[in-house]
Swiss-Prot record:
The UvrABC repair system catalyzes the recognition and processing of DNA lesions. UvrC both incises the 5' and 3' sides of the lesion. The N-terminal half is responsible for the 3' incision and the C-terminal half is responsible for the 5' incision. This is UvrABC system protein C. Transmembrane segments: none annotated. InterPro entries: GIY-YIG_endonuc (IPR000305), GIY-YIG_endonuc_sf (IPR035901), GIY-YIG_UvrC_Cho (IPR047296), Hlx-hairpin-Hlx_DNA-bd_motif (IPR003583), RuvA_2-like (IPR010994), UVR_dom (IPR001943), UVR_dom_sf (IPR036876), UvrABC_protein_C (IPR050066). It comes from Actinobacillus succinogenes (strain ATCC 55618 / DSM 22257 / CCUG 43843 / 130Z). Pfam families: GIY-YIG (PF01541), HHH_5 (PF14520), UVR (PF02151), UvrC_RNaseH (PF22920), UvrC_RNaseH_dom (PF08459). Signal peptide: none annotated. PANTHER family: UVRABC SYSTEM PROTEIN C, UVRC/OXIDOREDUCTASE.
Amino acid sequence: MFDSKAFLKNVPHDPGVYRMFDKTDTVIYVGKAKDLKKRLSSYFRPNLSSKKTEALVASITRIETTITTSETEALLLEHNYIKTFQPRYNVLLRDDKSYPYILLTKERHPRIAAYRGAKKIQGEYFGPYPHAGAVRETLSLLQKLFPIRQCENSVYKNRSRPCLQYQIGRCCAPCVAGYVTDEEYQAQVEYARLFLQGKDQQVLDHLIAKMETASRALDFENAARFRDQIQAVRAVIEKQFVSNDRLDDMDIISIAYRHGVACVQVLFIRQGKVLGNRSYFPKVPANTDLSELTATFVGQFYLQAHQGRTVPNSIVVDHKLEAKEEIEQLLSEQAGRKVSIQDNAKGSKSKYLSLAQMNAKAALTLKLKESTLISERYRALRELLDMDKINRMECFDISHTMGEQTIASCVVFNDAGPFKSEYRRFNIEGITGGDDYAAMEQALKKRYDRDLTPEKIPDIIFIDGGKGQLNRALKAFGELNVKWDKNRPHLIGIAKGVDRRAGQETLILSKTGREVNLDPDNLALHLIQHIRDESHNHAISGHRKKRQKAFTQSGLETIEGVGPKRRQALLKYLGGMQGVKNATLEEIASVPGISRALAEIIFETLKH
Protein backbone atom coordinates (compact mmCIF):
# COMPACT_ATOMS: atom_id res chain seq x y z
CA MET A 1 0.00 0.00 0.00
CA PHE A 2 1.49 3.35 -1.07
CA ASP A 3 1.97 5.85 1.77
CA SER A 4 1.33 9.13 -0.05
CA LYS A 5 1.62 11.32 3.05
CA ALA A 6 5.09 10.06 3.88
CA PHE A 7 6.18 10.37 0.26
CA LEU A 8 4.89 13.92 -0.27
CA LYS A 9 6.72 15.24 2.80
CA ASN A 10 10.01 14.93 0.93
CA VAL A 11 8.99 16.06 -2.56
CA PRO A 12 10.50 19.48 -3.43
CA HIS A 13 8.82 22.53 -5.00
CA ASP A 14 10.96 22.17 -8.14
CA PRO A 15 10.20 21.48 -11.79
CA GLY A 16 10.73 17.90 -12.87
CA VAL A 17 9.40 14.60 -14.10
CA TYR A 18 7.75 11.82 -12.07
CA ARG A 19 7.32 8.13 -12.81
CA MET A 20 4.60 6.05 -11.17
CA PHE A 21 4.98 2.27 -10.74
CA ASP A 22 2.46 -0.51 -10.13
CA LYS A 23 2.83 -3.69 -8.06
CA THR A 24 4.78 -5.43 -10.85
CA ASP A 25 7.31 -2.56 -10.78
CA THR A 26 6.17 -1.42 -14.22
CA VAL A 27 6.03 2.28 -15.06
CA ILE A 28 2.35 3.08 -15.51
CA TYR A 29 2.50 6.87 -15.83
CA VAL A 30 5.07 9.57 -16.55
CA GLY A 31 4.26 13.22 -15.98
CA LYS A 32 5.95 16.60 -15.76
CA ALA A 33 5.38 19.48 -13.39
CA LYS A 34 6.45 23.06 -12.84
CA ASP A 35 6.15 22.30 -9.12
CA LEU A 36 6.54 18.59 -8.33
CA LYS A 37 5.10 18.86 -4.82
CA LYS A 38 1.95 20.67 -5.91
CA ARG A 39 1.39 18.41 -8.89
CA LEU A 40 1.89 15.14 -7.03
CA SER A 41 -0.21 16.34 -4.09
CA SER A 42 -3.12 16.83 -6.48
CA TYR A 43 -3.29 13.07 -7.09
CA PHE A 44 -4.12 12.35 -3.47
CA ARG A 45 -7.01 14.77 -2.87
CA PRO A 46 -10.37 13.37 -1.72
CA ASN A 47 -12.16 14.21 -4.97
CA LEU A 48 -10.20 13.35 -8.11
CA SER A 49 -10.98 14.83 -11.51
CA SER A 50 -11.66 11.64 -13.47
CA LYS A 51 -12.16 7.88 -13.30
CA LYS A 52 -8.88 7.44 -15.15
CA THR A 53 -7.02 9.32 -12.42
CA GLU A 54 -8.78 7.25 -9.75
CA ALA A 55 -7.71 4.02 -11.47
CA LEU A 56 -4.16 5.33 -11.84
CA VAL A 57 -3.85 6.32 -8.18
CA ALA A 58 -5.29 2.98 -7.04
CA SER A 59 -2.51 1.17 -8.92
CA ILE A 60 0.45 3.16 -7.55
CA THR A 61 2.94 1.33 -5.33
CA ARG A 62 5.83 3.79 -5.62
CA ILE A 63 6.84 7.03 -7.33
CA GLU A 64 10.23 8.20 -8.58
CA THR A 65 11.04 11.83 -9.36
CA THR A 66 13.70 13.54 -11.47
CA ILE A 67 14.33 17.23 -10.79
CA THR A 68 15.06 19.44 -13.82
CA THR A 69 16.39 22.98 -14.11
CA SER A 70 13.35 24.26 -16.00
CA GLU A 71 9.85 23.33 -17.05
CA THR A 72 11.03 23.07 -20.68
CA GLU A 73 13.67 20.54 -19.70
CA ALA A 74 11.01 18.63 -17.77
CA LEU A 75 8.90 18.50 -20.93
CA LEU A 76 11.79 17.08 -22.98
CA LEU A 77 12.70 14.52 -20.34
CA GLU A 78 9.07 13.50 -19.94
CA HIS A 79 9.02 12.90 -23.69
CA ASN A 80 12.12 10.70 -23.45
CA TYR A 81 10.75 8.64 -20.55
CA ILE A 82 7.41 8.10 -22.24
CA LYS A 83 9.16 6.86 -25.38
CA THR A 84 11.26 4.56 -23.21
CA PHE A 85 8.58 3.08 -20.93
CA GLN A 86 5.38 3.52 -22.96
CA PRO A 87 3.22 3.70 -19.81
CA ARG A 88 -0.34 2.55 -20.24
CA TYR A 89 -1.86 5.68 -18.66
CA ASN A 90 -0.01 8.04 -21.05
CA VAL A 91 -2.36 7.16 -23.88
CA LEU A 92 -2.46 10.68 -25.37
CA LEU A 93 1.29 10.78 -25.82
CA ARG A 94 1.90 7.37 -27.37
CA ASP A 95 2.30 8.77 -30.87
CA ASP A 96 4.91 11.19 -30.13
CA LYS A 97 17.27 -4.49 -15.62
CA SER A 98 23.72 -4.67 -16.23
CA TYR A 99 22.55 -2.06 -18.91
CA PRO A 100 21.13 -3.21 -22.22
CA TYR A 101 22.85 -2.37 -25.49
CA ILE A 102 22.05 -2.69 -29.17
CA LEU A 103 24.42 -5.06 -30.96
CA LEU A 104 25.25 -4.89 -34.67
CA THR A 105 27.08 -8.15 -35.40
CA LYS A 106 30.13 -8.55 -37.61
CA GLU A 107 29.01 -11.06 -40.25
CA ARG A 108 28.43 -11.29 -43.99
CA HIS A 109 24.83 -10.26 -43.31
CA PRO A 110 24.94 -8.51 -39.91
CA ARG A 111 21.97 -8.77 -37.60
CA ILE A 112 20.83 -6.19 -35.09
CA ALA A 113 19.66 -7.25 -31.64
CA ALA A 114 19.33 -6.37 -27.97
CA TYR A 115 22.28 -7.46 -25.85
CA ARG A 116 23.27 -7.64 -22.19
CA GLY A 117 26.43 -8.77 -20.45
CA ALA A 118 30.09 -9.03 -21.39
CA LYS A 119 30.82 -8.12 -24.99
CA LYS A 120 31.92 -11.53 -26.23
CA ILE A 121 30.20 -11.38 -29.62
CA GLN A 122 32.10 -9.61 -32.40
CA GLY A 123 30.36 -6.48 -33.54
CA GLU A 124 29.50 -2.90 -32.58
CA TYR A 125 27.66 -2.04 -29.37
CA PHE A 126 25.48 1.05 -28.99
CA GLY A 127 24.34 2.35 -25.61
CA PRO A 128 24.01 1.97 -22.71
CA TYR A 129 20.24 2.37 -22.64
CA PRO A 130 18.72 2.97 -19.21
CA HIS A 131 16.06 0.28 -19.64
CA ALA A 132 15.25 -2.69 -21.87
CA GLY A 133 12.10 -0.91 -23.04
CA ALA A 134 14.23 1.75 -24.72
CA VAL A 135 16.17 -0.94 -26.59
CA ARG A 136 13.00 -2.70 -27.76
CA GLU A 137 11.55 0.56 -29.00
CA THR A 138 14.73 1.47 -30.87
CA LEU A 139 14.96 -1.97 -32.50
CA SER A 140 11.36 -1.76 -33.61
CA LEU A 141 12.05 1.67 -35.06
CA LEU A 142 15.20 0.53 -36.86
CA GLN A 143 13.36 -2.40 -38.38
CA LYS A 144 10.83 -0.02 -39.91
CA LEU A 145 13.49 2.35 -41.25
CA PHE A 146 16.20 -0.07 -42.34
CA PRO A 147 15.16 -3.67 -43.19
CA ILE A 148 18.03 -5.48 -41.45
CA ARG A 149 17.53 -8.97 -40.09
CA GLN A 150 16.97 -9.40 -36.35
CA CYS A 151 16.61 -13.20 -36.37
CA GLU A 152 18.97 -15.62 -34.63
CA ASN A 153 21.59 -17.35 -36.78
CA SER A 154 19.88 -20.71 -36.19
CA VAL A 155 16.84 -19.34 -38.04
CA TYR A 156 18.80 -17.34 -40.63
CA LYS A 157 20.90 -20.33 -41.74
CA ASN A 158 17.94 -22.68 -42.14
CA ARG A 159 15.57 -20.62 -44.28
CA SER A 160 14.56 -21.88 -47.71
CA ARG A 161 12.17 -19.00 -48.38
CA PRO A 162 11.65 -15.52 -46.85
CA CYS A 163 9.75 -15.24 -43.58
CA LEU A 164 6.85 -12.97 -42.65
CA GLN A 165 9.22 -10.09 -41.80
CA TYR A 166 10.08 -9.84 -45.50
CA GLN A 167 6.40 -9.91 -46.48
CA ILE A 168 5.63 -6.89 -44.28
CA GLY A 169 8.73 -4.94 -45.33
CA ARG A 170 10.70 -5.34 -42.09
CA CYS A 171 13.55 -7.41 -43.58
CA CYS A 172 15.08 -7.67 -47.06
CA ALA A 173 15.60 -11.46 -46.80
CA PRO A 174 19.39 -11.86 -46.97
CA CYS A 175 18.82 -15.47 -45.86
CA VAL A 176 17.62 -16.49 -49.34
CA ALA A 177 19.63 -15.90 -52.51
CA GLY A 178 18.21 -13.55 -55.11
CA TYR A 179 16.28 -11.14 -52.90
CA VAL A 180 18.99 -8.61 -51.99
CA THR A 181 22.62 -8.21 -53.03
CA ASP A 182 25.39 -8.00 -50.45
CA GLU A 183 26.06 -4.38 -51.49
CA GLU A 184 22.41 -3.37 -51.04
CA TYR A 185 22.24 -5.06 -47.64
CA GLN A 186 25.50 -3.45 -46.45
CA ALA A 187 24.12 -0.04 -47.45
CA GLN A 188 21.14 -0.56 -45.12
CA VAL A 189 23.51 -1.72 -42.37
CA GLU A 190 25.57 1.45 -42.79
CA TYR A 191 22.43 3.62 -42.55
CA ALA A 192 21.48 1.88 -39.30
CA ARG A 193 25.01 2.33 -37.95
CA LEU A 194 25.02 6.06 -38.71
CA PHE A 195 21.53 6.44 -37.23
CA LEU A 196 22.60 4.74 -33.97
CA GLN A 197 25.65 7.01 -33.85
CA GLY A 198 23.35 10.03 -33.97
CA LYS A 199 24.47 11.02 -37.48
CA ASP A 200 20.93 11.48 -38.71
CA GLN A 201 21.79 14.10 -41.34
CA GLN A 202 24.38 11.82 -42.94
CA VAL A 203 21.70 9.15 -43.32
CA LEU A 204 19.41 11.65 -45.04
CA ASP A 205 22.21 12.91 -47.30
CA HIS A 206 23.01 9.35 -48.43
CA LEU A 207 19.36 8.52 -49.09
CA ILE A 208 18.70 11.77 -50.97
CA ALA A 209 21.72 11.13 -53.19
CA LYS A 210 20.45 7.59 -53.88
CA MET A 211 16.99 8.91 -54.73
CA GLU A 212 18.36 11.52 -57.13
CA THR A 213 20.61 8.95 -58.83
CA ALA A 214 17.67 6.58 -59.29
CA SER A 215 15.52 9.41 -60.69
CA ARG A 216 18.16 10.41 -63.24
CA ALA A 217 18.40 6.77 -64.32
CA LEU A 218 14.58 6.70 -64.70
CA ASP A 219 14.46 3.98 -62.03
CA PHE A 220 11.29 5.41 -60.52
CA GLU A 221 10.45 2.33 -58.45
CA ASN A 222 13.70 2.59 -56.47
CA ALA A 223 13.43 6.38 -56.35
CA ALA A 224 10.00 6.04 -54.71
CA ARG A 225 11.38 3.51 -52.24
CA PHE A 226 14.19 5.90 -51.23
CA ARG A 227 11.68 8.77 -51.01
CA ASP A 228 9.53 6.78 -48.55
CA GLN A 229 12.61 5.90 -46.50
CA ILE A 230 13.65 9.57 -46.39
CA GLN A 231 10.19 10.60 -45.17
CA ALA A 232 10.25 7.92 -42.46
CA VAL A 233 13.69 8.98 -41.20
CA ARG A 234 12.69 12.66 -41.18
CA ALA A 235 9.55 11.87 -39.18
CA VAL A 236 11.66 10.11 -36.55
CA ILE A 237 14.27 12.88 -36.36
CA GLU A 238 11.55 15.49 -35.79
CA LYS A 239 10.28 13.56 -32.76
CA GLN A 240 13.63 12.64 -31.24
CA PHE A 241 14.60 13.92 -27.80
CA VAL A 242 17.89 15.77 -28.36
CA SER A 243 19.65 18.21 -26.07
CA ASN A 244 19.93 21.73 -27.48
CA ASP A 245 23.66 21.53 -26.75
CA ARG A 246 25.43 18.98 -28.94
CA LEU A 247 27.33 17.45 -26.06
CA ASP A 248 29.85 14.65 -26.33
CA ASP A 249 29.07 11.17 -25.01
CA MET A 250 29.37 11.63 -21.27
CA ASP A 251 28.23 10.47 -17.87
CA ILE A 252 27.55 13.01 -15.14
CA ILE A 253 28.19 11.63 -11.63
CA SER A 254 27.18 13.34 -8.40
CA ILE A 255 27.21 12.10 -4.80
CA ALA A 256 24.98 13.10 -1.90
CA TYR A 257 25.80 11.87 1.61
CA ARG A 258 23.88 12.15 4.87
CA HIS A 259 23.46 10.09 8.05
CA GLY A 260 25.84 7.40 6.88
CA VAL A 261 24.03 6.82 3.57
CA ALA A 262 25.42 7.80 0.17
CA CYS A 263 23.55 8.21 -3.11
CA VAL A 264 25.47 8.22 -6.38
CA GLN A 265 23.46 9.71 -9.21
CA VAL A 266 24.53 8.97 -12.81
CA LEU A 267 23.07 10.98 -15.69
CA PHE A 268 23.66 9.37 -19.11
CA ILE A 269 24.14 11.56 -22.20
CA ARG A 270 24.79 9.89 -25.56
CA GLN A 271 25.05 11.70 -28.91
CA GLY A 272 23.55 14.80 -27.29
CA LYS A 273 20.56 12.83 -26.00
CA VAL A 274 19.80 12.52 -22.29
CA LEU A 275 18.97 8.80 -22.10
CA GLY A 276 18.01 8.90 -18.42
CA ASN A 277 19.39 8.69 -14.90
CA ARG A 278 19.92 6.07 -12.20
CA SER A 279 20.59 6.17 -8.47
CA TYR A 280 23.02 3.86 -6.67
CA PHE A 281 23.34 3.37 -2.93
CA PRO A 282 26.73 1.73 -2.25
CA LYS A 283 27.66 0.53 1.20
CA VAL A 284 29.95 3.19 2.65
CA PRO A 285 32.26 2.69 5.66
CA ALA A 286 32.04 5.33 8.37
CA ASN A 287 33.97 8.57 7.77
CA THR A 288 34.68 7.80 4.11
CA ASP A 289 35.95 10.82 2.18
CA LEU A 290 33.64 11.66 -0.73
CA SER A 291 36.59 12.02 -3.12
CA GLU A 292 37.60 8.48 -2.23
CA LEU A 293 34.04 7.28 -2.69
CA THR A 294 33.89 8.95 -6.11
CA ALA A 295 37.13 7.31 -7.24
CA THR A 296 36.01 3.90 -5.96
CA PHE A 297 32.64 4.16 -7.66
CA VAL A 298 34.12 5.26 -11.00
CA GLY A 299 36.57 2.37 -10.89
CA GLN A 300 33.94 -0.26 -10.06
CA PHE A 301 31.39 1.18 -12.45
CA TYR A 302 33.56 1.24 -15.57
CA LEU A 303 36.45 -1.17 -15.07
CA GLN A 304 34.45 -4.34 -14.40
CA ALA A 305 34.44 -5.72 -17.93
CA HIS A 306 31.83 -8.41 -17.18
CA GLN A 307 29.21 -5.69 -16.82
CA GLY A 308 29.72 -4.84 -20.48
CA ARG A 309 29.54 -1.08 -19.99
CA THR A 310 30.66 1.38 -22.65
CA VAL A 311 32.98 4.03 -21.27
CA PRO A 312 31.96 7.50 -22.51
CA ASN A 313 34.48 10.03 -23.82
CA SER A 314 33.95 12.24 -20.81
CA ILE A 315 33.02 11.67 -17.16
CA VAL A 316 32.01 14.69 -15.09
CA VAL A 317 32.23 14.41 -11.28
CA ASP A 318 31.61 16.83 -8.43
CA HIS A 319 34.60 15.86 -6.23
CA LYS A 320 38.31 16.05 -7.01
CA LEU A 321 40.02 12.69 -7.51
CA GLU A 322 43.52 12.19 -6.15
CA ALA A 323 44.27 9.44 -8.69
CA LYS A 324 42.49 11.12 -11.59
CA GLU A 325 45.33 10.67 -14.10
CA GLU A 326 45.69 6.98 -13.27
CA ILE A 327 41.97 6.33 -13.62
CA GLU A 328 41.88 8.26 -16.90
CA GLN A 329 44.75 6.15 -18.23
CA LEU A 330 43.04 2.88 -17.27
CA LEU A 331 39.74 3.94 -18.79
CA SER A 332 41.44 5.17 -21.96
CA GLU A 333 43.23 1.85 -22.35
CA GLN A 334 39.99 -0.04 -21.88
CA ALA A 335 38.08 2.17 -24.32
CA GLY A 336 40.87 2.36 -26.91
CA ARG A 337 40.56 6.15 -27.03
CA LYS A 338 41.09 9.13 -24.78
CA VAL A 339 38.72 9.32 -21.82
CA SER A 340 38.75 12.42 -19.64
CA ILE A 341 37.47 12.97 -16.11
CA GLN A 342 36.43 16.52 -15.30
CA ASP A 343 35.95 17.85 -11.78
CA ASN A 344 35.58 21.53 -12.73
CA ALA A 345 32.63 21.46 -15.10
CA LYS A 346 31.75 24.68 -16.92
CA GLY A 347 29.01 25.83 -19.24
CA SER A 348 26.51 23.18 -20.29
CA LYS A 349 28.36 20.49 -18.35
CA SER A 350 28.01 22.55 -15.18
CA LYS A 351 24.26 22.80 -15.78
CA TYR A 352 23.94 19.03 -16.10
CA LEU A 353 26.14 18.46 -13.04
CA SER A 354 23.82 20.71 -11.01
CA LEU A 355 20.91 18.65 -12.30
CA ALA A 356 22.62 15.43 -11.18
CA GLN A 357 23.35 16.98 -7.77
CA MET A 358 19.71 17.93 -7.27
CA ASN A 359 18.57 14.43 -8.19
CA ALA A 360 21.17 12.83 -5.90
CA LYS A 361 19.94 14.89 -2.94
CA ALA A 362 16.29 14.18 -3.71
CA ALA A 363 16.90 10.42 -4.10
CA LEU A 364 18.90 10.35 -0.85
CA THR A 365 16.13 12.14 1.05
CA LEU A 366 13.61 9.57 -0.16
CA LYS A 367 15.97 6.70 0.67
CA LEU A 368 16.49 7.95 4.22
CA LYS A 369 12.75 8.38 4.67
CA GLU A 370 12.20 4.87 3.32
CA SER A 371 14.78 3.47 5.76
CA THR A 372 13.09 5.27 8.64
CA LEU A 373 9.71 3.94 7.55
CA ILE A 374 11.05 0.36 7.33
CA SER A 375 12.44 0.69 10.87
CA GLU A 376 9.07 1.93 12.12
CA ARG A 377 7.29 -0.98 10.42
CA TYR A 378 9.71 -3.49 11.93
CA ARG A 379 9.15 -2.01 15.36
CA ALA A 380 5.37 -2.28 14.92
CA LEU A 381 5.71 -5.94 13.89
CA ARG A 382 7.96 -6.73 16.87
CA GLU A 383 5.39 -5.21 19.19
CA LEU A 384 2.55 -7.13 17.54
CA LEU A 385 4.36 -10.47 17.91
CA ASP A 386 6.02 -9.62 21.24
CA MET A 387 9.48 -10.32 19.79
CA ASP A 388 12.70 -8.64 20.95
CA LYS A 389 14.27 -8.63 17.51
CA ILE A 390 13.57 -9.63 13.92
CA ASN A 391 16.71 -10.09 11.85
CA ARG A 392 15.38 -12.16 8.97
CA MET A 393 11.97 -12.90 7.50
CA GLU A 394 11.06 -15.18 4.59
CA CYS A 395 7.81 -15.52 2.67
CA PHE A 396 6.56 -18.27 0.33
CA ASP A 397 4.03 -18.23 -2.50
CA ILE A 398 2.95 -20.68 -5.22
CA SER A 399 2.18 -19.87 -8.85
CA HIS A 400 0.89 -22.08 -11.69
CA THR A 401 -1.56 -22.15 -14.59
CA MET A 402 -4.19 -24.86 -14.25
CA GLY A 403 -1.69 -26.90 -12.25
CA GLU A 404 1.04 -26.68 -14.93
CA GLN A 405 4.60 -25.28 -14.62
CA THR A 406 4.25 -24.85 -10.86
CA ILE A 407 6.81 -22.55 -9.22
CA ALA A 408 7.31 -21.71 -5.55
CA SER A 409 9.02 -18.48 -4.56
CA CYS A 410 10.87 -17.52 -1.41
CA VAL A 411 11.74 -13.89 -0.74
CA VAL A 412 13.89 -12.65 2.11
CA PHE A 413 13.73 -9.42 4.11
CA ASN A 414 16.29 -8.20 6.62
CA ASP A 415 16.21 -5.04 8.72
CA ALA A 416 16.98 -2.95 5.61
CA GLY A 417 14.06 -4.35 3.63
CA PRO A 418 14.19 -6.70 0.60
CA PHE A 419 17.36 -8.85 0.49
CA LYS A 420 17.12 -9.67 -3.21
CA SER A 421 20.34 -11.64 -3.55
CA GLU A 422 18.77 -14.22 -1.21
CA TYR A 423 15.56 -14.63 -3.23
CA ARG A 424 15.00 -18.17 -4.50
CA ARG A 425 12.59 -20.08 -6.74
CA PHE A 426 11.81 -23.80 -6.65
CA ASN A 427 10.51 -26.01 -9.45
CA ILE A 428 7.70 -28.14 -8.03
CA GLU A 429 7.45 -31.64 -9.46
CA GLY A 430 5.80 -34.97 -8.74
CA ILE A 431 2.57 -33.61 -7.26
CA THR A 432 -1.04 -33.56 -8.42
CA GLY A 433 -1.54 -30.51 -10.62
CA GLY A 434 -3.07 -27.64 -8.66
CA ASP A 435 -2.32 -29.11 -5.21
CA ASP A 436 -1.00 -25.94 -3.57
CA TYR A 437 -0.67 -27.66 -0.19
CA ALA A 438 1.71 -30.30 -1.57
CA ALA A 439 3.57 -27.62 -3.51
CA MET A 440 4.09 -25.59 -0.35
CA GLU A 441 5.31 -28.64 1.57
CA GLN A 442 7.81 -29.49 -1.17
CA ALA A 443 9.09 -25.91 -1.34
CA LEU A 444 9.61 -25.70 2.43
CA LYS A 445 11.50 -28.99 2.51
CA LYS A 446 13.71 -27.93 -0.39
CA ARG A 447 14.46 -24.70 1.44
CA TYR A 448 14.96 -25.90 5.00
CA ASP A 449 15.80 -29.61 4.97
CA ARG A 450 19.53 -28.87 5.10
CA ASP A 451 22.14 -27.28 7.32
CA LEU A 452 21.68 -23.57 7.93
CA THR A 453 24.12 -21.14 9.50
CA PRO A 454 22.64 -19.13 12.41
CA GLU A 455 22.26 -15.95 10.35
CA LYS A 456 20.32 -17.86 7.66
CA ILE A 457 17.68 -19.14 10.08
CA PRO A 458 14.60 -16.92 9.68
CA ASP A 459 12.85 -15.46 12.71
CA ILE A 460 9.53 -15.38 10.84
CA ILE A 461 8.24 -17.41 7.89
CA PHE A 462 5.14 -16.06 6.19
CA ILE A 463 2.92 -18.48 4.27
CA ASP A 464 0.67 -16.86 1.68
CA GLY A 465 -2.47 -18.83 2.52
CA GLY A 466 -4.99 -19.68 5.22
CA LYS A 467 -5.19 -22.39 7.88
CA GLY A 468 -4.81 -25.25 5.42
CA GLN A 469 -1.58 -23.94 3.99
CA LEU A 470 -0.22 -23.09 7.43
CA ASN A 471 -1.03 -26.55 8.82
CA ARG A 472 0.71 -28.19 5.86
CA ALA A 473 3.72 -25.95 6.49
CA LEU A 474 3.79 -26.97 10.16
CA LYS A 475 3.62 -30.62 9.10
CA ALA A 476 6.59 -30.09 6.76
CA PHE A 477 8.59 -28.49 9.56
CA GLY A 478 7.72 -31.31 11.91
CA GLU A 479 9.25 -33.79 9.46
CA LEU A 480 12.54 -31.89 9.07
CA ASN A 481 15.59 -33.78 10.29
CA VAL A 482 18.05 -30.94 10.85
CA LYS A 483 20.60 -29.84 13.43
CA TRP A 484 19.47 -26.24 13.65
CA ASP A 485 16.53 -25.24 15.88
CA LYS A 486 13.51 -25.79 13.64
CA ASN A 487 11.24 -24.39 16.35
CA ARG A 488 12.87 -20.99 16.18
CA PRO A 489 10.98 -19.60 13.15
CA HIS A 490 7.51 -18.26 13.86
CA LEU A 491 5.25 -19.51 11.03
CA ILE A 492 2.46 -17.09 10.15
CA GLY A 493 -0.31 -17.61 7.59
CA ILE A 494 -1.62 -14.65 5.60
CA ALA A 495 -5.25 -15.37 4.72
CA LYS A 496 -6.95 -13.04 2.25
CA GLY A 497 -10.26 -11.41 3.08
CA VAL A 498 -13.62 -12.41 1.63
CA ASP A 499 -13.28 -10.12 -1.40
CA ARG A 500 -9.45 -10.48 -1.47
CA ARG A 501 -8.84 -6.76 -1.04
CA ALA A 502 -5.65 -5.38 0.50
CA GLY A 503 -6.14 -4.38 4.12
CA GLN A 504 -8.58 -7.20 4.91
CA GLU A 505 -5.98 -9.94 5.53
CA THR A 506 -6.16 -12.21 8.57
CA LEU A 507 -2.89 -13.23 10.22
CA ILE A 508 -2.83 -16.74 11.67
CA LEU A 509 -0.09 -17.04 14.32
CA SER A 510 1.14 -20.62 14.67
CA LYS A 511 2.78 -20.20 18.10
CA THR A 512 -0.34 -18.91 19.83
CA GLY A 513 -3.14 -20.03 17.50
CA ARG A 514 -4.45 -16.46 17.43
CA GLU A 515 -6.10 -14.93 14.39
CA VAL A 516 -5.39 -11.23 14.05
CA ASN A 517 -7.08 -8.63 11.86
CA LEU A 518 -5.12 -5.39 11.72
CA ASP A 519 -6.29 -1.92 10.84
CA PRO A 520 -5.50 -1.06 7.17
CA ASP A 521 -3.23 1.78 8.37
CA ASN A 522 -1.23 -0.45 10.72
CA LEU A 523 2.51 -0.24 9.96
CA ALA A 524 3.07 -3.92 10.76
CA LEU A 525 0.42 -4.85 8.19
CA HIS A 526 2.14 -2.65 5.60
CA LEU A 527 5.39 -4.57 6.13
CA ILE A 528 3.60 -7.91 5.83
CA GLN A 529 1.83 -6.76 2.66
CA HIS A 530 5.17 -5.67 1.24
CA ILE A 531 6.88 -9.03 1.75
CA ARG A 532 3.75 -10.91 0.62
CA ASP A 533 3.54 -8.86 -2.60
CA GLU A 534 7.26 -9.36 -3.26
CA SER A 535 6.81 -13.12 -2.92
CA HIS A 536 3.75 -13.08 -5.16
CA ASN A 537 5.49 -11.11 -7.91
CA HIS A 538 8.62 -13.27 -7.66
CA ALA A 539 6.52 -16.43 -8.05
CA ILE A 540 4.53 -15.08 -10.99
CA SER A 541 7.62 -13.91 -12.90
CA GLY A 542 9.28 -17.31 -12.39
CA HIS A 543 6.17 -19.15 -13.51
CA ARG A 544 5.87 -17.02 -16.65
CA LYS A 545 9.48 -17.76 -17.59
CA LYS A 546 8.94 -21.49 -17.08
CA ARG A 547 5.70 -21.42 -19.04
CA GLN A 548 7.31 -19.48 -21.89
CA LYS A 549 10.22 -21.91 -22.01
CA ALA A 550 7.84 -24.86 -22.23
CA PHE A 551 5.85 -23.08 -24.91
CA THR A 552 8.86 -22.25 -27.09
CA GLN A 553 10.58 -25.64 -26.89
CA SER A 554 10.32 -27.39 -30.24
CA GLY A 555 9.58 -30.82 -28.78
CA LEU A 556 12.62 -32.33 -30.47
CA GLU A 557 14.84 -31.62 -27.44
CA THR A 558 13.13 -34.34 -25.40
CA ILE A 559 13.49 -37.12 -28.00
CA GLU A 560 16.32 -39.51 -27.24
CA GLY A 561 18.75 -39.81 -30.16
CA VAL A 562 17.99 -36.36 -31.58
CA GLY A 563 20.95 -34.16 -30.77
CA PRO A 564 21.74 -30.63 -31.98
CA LYS A 565 22.99 -31.75 -35.44
CA ARG A 566 20.01 -33.98 -36.19
CA ARG A 567 17.64 -31.35 -34.84
CA GLN A 568 19.21 -28.76 -37.15
CA ALA A 569 18.97 -31.13 -40.11
CA LEU A 570 15.28 -31.78 -39.45
CA LEU A 571 14.49 -28.08 -39.20
CA LYS A 572 16.52 -27.26 -42.30
CA TYR A 573 15.20 -29.97 -44.63
CA LEU A 574 11.59 -29.85 -43.49
CA GLY A 575 11.21 -26.05 -43.29
CA GLY A 576 11.16 -25.32 -39.58
CA MET A 577 9.29 -26.84 -36.64
CA GLN A 578 5.89 -26.54 -38.27
CA GLY A 579 7.20 -28.46 -41.25
CA VAL A 580 8.56 -31.20 -38.99
CA LYS A 581 5.23 -31.53 -37.21
CA ASN A 582 3.33 -31.74 -40.50
CA ALA A 583 5.79 -34.13 -42.17
CA THR A 584 4.94 -37.74 -43.00
CA LEU A 585 6.98 -40.64 -41.68
CA GLU A 586 8.62 -41.05 -45.10
CA GLU A 587 9.59 -37.37 -45.25
CA ILE A 588 11.21 -37.53 -41.81
CA ALA A 589 13.09 -40.70 -42.75
CA SER A 590 14.42 -38.99 -45.89
CA VAL A 591 16.32 -36.38 -43.87
CA PRO A 592 20.10 -37.09 -43.89
CA GLY A 593 21.22 -38.71 -40.64
CA ILE A 594 17.73 -39.90 -39.63
CA SER A 595 17.22 -43.67 -39.70
CA ARG A 596 13.85 -45.30 -40.30
CA ALA A 597 13.68 -46.42 -36.67
CA LEU A 598 14.48 -42.93 -35.35
CA ALA A 599 12.01 -41.40 -37.81
CA GLU A 600 9.26 -43.61 -36.35
CA ILE A 601 10.12 -42.44 -32.82
CA ILE A 602 10.11 -38.78 -33.91
CA PHE A 603 6.85 -39.18 -35.82
CA GLU A 604 5.03 -40.90 -32.95
CA THR A 605 6.37 -38.47 -30.33
CA LEU A 606 5.29 -35.37 -32.22
CA LYS A 607 1.90 -36.80 -33.16
CA HIS A 608 1.03 -37.90 -29.64
